[in-house]
Amino acid sequence: MKSVTLKELSLLLDGVVQGDETLVINSVATLEHATAGQISFLANSKYRAQLESTQASAVLLSAKDAQDYSGTALVVKDPYVGFARVAQLLDTTPKAAIGIHPSAQIDPSALLGEGVAIGANAVIGANVILGENVQIGAGTVIGQDCIIGSNTRLWANVTLYHNVHLGQDCIIHSGAIIGSDGFGYANERGQWIKIPQTGGVRIGDRVEIGASSTIDRGALGHTEIHNGVIIDNQVQVAHNDIIGENTAIAGSTTLAGSVTIGKHCIIGGNCAIAGHLTIADGVHLSGATNVTGNMREPGLYSSATVAMENKVWRKNTVRFRQLDELFQRVKTLEKNSNTPE
């Protein structure tokens, strides 16, 4: 088990210890469930009531919250960021054993860096390049001409089609499929003609892609996911989409083809973005927002209808259907009221 003293954590986080700096911390936990040897945090005022009753050995607090706290604390600028850093330091996620499992199938032309780990029944195709310390989980398939940067991890049962490039320090979770064909067809007299998807996928450094998400290859040119992007579970990224640096996309969101999303955007869960649109840097979409036009200015955008009692929703649905009629009636009334007698 990993462990660290509060003094060492204060140096890591540029914080100040309030209490015993020799206290040893071995893991992180919530205020409600923490026990001795664990450190917790307060980043949301909704949980302030749990602060006095917590059994945590220490708590990450802002300077303001630390003033009224009698227990041991590590005072930092941002308790949530501090929690993330400590959680990384004490992370106990198991790492794959270095080496190649006997059941793995590796093409002779593949180039493997030092320290790679390849699990049972994994398949590595022709001309694949794996950087140093790459971890390939059991049952994962890497198609030909793929490149995977150093320290990237693919968990079990990930599929990379051909011509997919992953940067360094990426994490791809189980069930993710990268490089499948985009939804490209032409219609000739009622019949669909498949358009070969001849591009690839280019993914930058420090990208994380959640379980069962799908990233389509480009039709012509590449689908691009830039450095620092985080994508949640069950997200669909279509052909030729471009996602800017450090953008976050929450679960069940769907992007149609040829969408360009800027840097530092936050896309809430269950959003839908129509094709061939551009979204500016710094846009934040709240959950279940439907985007049908370009967004050229940063800011928070929403379109979802919030939950309400069914009887109220049914009445409002009827009223919504009557909006055009009501508008025309108001327009007529305004016109008549402005007509001289």
Swiss-Prot record:
GO-annotated biological processes: lipid A biosynthetic process
UniProt EC number: 2.3.1.191
Which residues does the Swiss-Prot or TrEMBL record annotate as the active site? H239 (proton acceptor)
Q: Which InterPro entries match?
A: Hexapep (IPR001451), LpxD (IPR007691), Trimer_LpxA-like_sf (IPR011004), UDP_GlcNAc_AcTrfase_non-rep (IPR020573)
EC primary class: transferase
- PROSITE patterns from the UniProt entry: HEXAPEP_TRANSFERASES (PS00101)
* Coiled coil location: none
Q: Which reaction does it catalyse?
A: a UDP-3-O-[(3R)-3-hydroxyacyl]-alpha-D-glucosamine + a (3R)-hydroxyacyl-[ACP] = a UDP-2-N,3-O-bis[(3R)-3-hydroxyacyl]-alpha-D-glucosamine + holo-[ACP] + H(+)
Q: Which UniProt keywords apply?
A: Acyltransferase, Lipid A biosynthesis, Lipid biosynthesis, Lipid metabolism, Repeat, Transferase
GO cellular component assignments = membrane
The domain of life is Bacteria
Cross-referenced SUPFAM superfamilies: Trimeric LpxA-like enzymes (SSF51161)
**Described function:** Catalyzes the N-acylation of UDP-3-O-acylglucosamine using 3-hydroxyacyl-ACP as the acyl donor. Is involved in the biosynthesis of lipid A, a phosphorylated glycolipid that anchors the lipopolysaccharide to the outer membrane of the cell.
The entry describes its oligomerization and partners as:
Homotrimer.
Similarity comment: family membership: Belongs to the transferase hexapeptide repeat family. LpxD subfamily.
Q: Which HAMAP family match?
A: LpxD
The name on file for this protein is UDP-3-O-acylglucosamine N-acyltransferase
Q: Which organism is it from?
A: Shewanella sp. (strain MR-7)
